[in-house]
Amino acid sequence: MLGELVYVKKDDLNKITRIWKSSEFKTGKFKTGWHPPHPSFFVKHEVYEKFGVFREDLEIAADYELMLRFLEKHKVKSAYIPQTLVKMREGGKSNWKSFSKVLKANLECYRSFKINQLPVSPFFIFIKPFSKIKQIRT
C-alpha cells in the first residue's frame, strides 16, 4: 500500500513545504526517478520474510533499495491510496538543503539498481532529482 506524503516546517506543522504526490506503481517507473514516499509505503510482514529487510550497508537509500527490490525486482503487488497518509517534519538523512547528501543519496539509489541486477541509465543520478522539483512549495 502506498499513498501521499506532505512535509511541513520543523517548527510549524501547518506550513507545508513539499507535497509528495505518488501514483499507481507500474514496472519501470523507478528508472524515471519515480518512487513512493517511503514513510507512506506499507507492506505485510510476509513480504519482509520472503524478500528480506533493509540493507544496513546503504546509509541514506536503504528505504529506496527496499522498495525497488519489492516492487521492481520481485513484483510485489501494491495498491495506491490517493490521499495523504503521512504528515512529516522536514529533515532526515537526504535533506534537500545539502547538495552532498542529495548526491550521496542518488548515488546509493543508482547502486540499488546494480545490487538488484536491474538495468539503469548512467544518467539516472541526474534524472531522479529533477523528478521531485515540482513537489516543492515556497
What spans do the regions from the language model cover?
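Hydrophobic helical membrane-anchoring modules
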Residues: K87, G91-T138
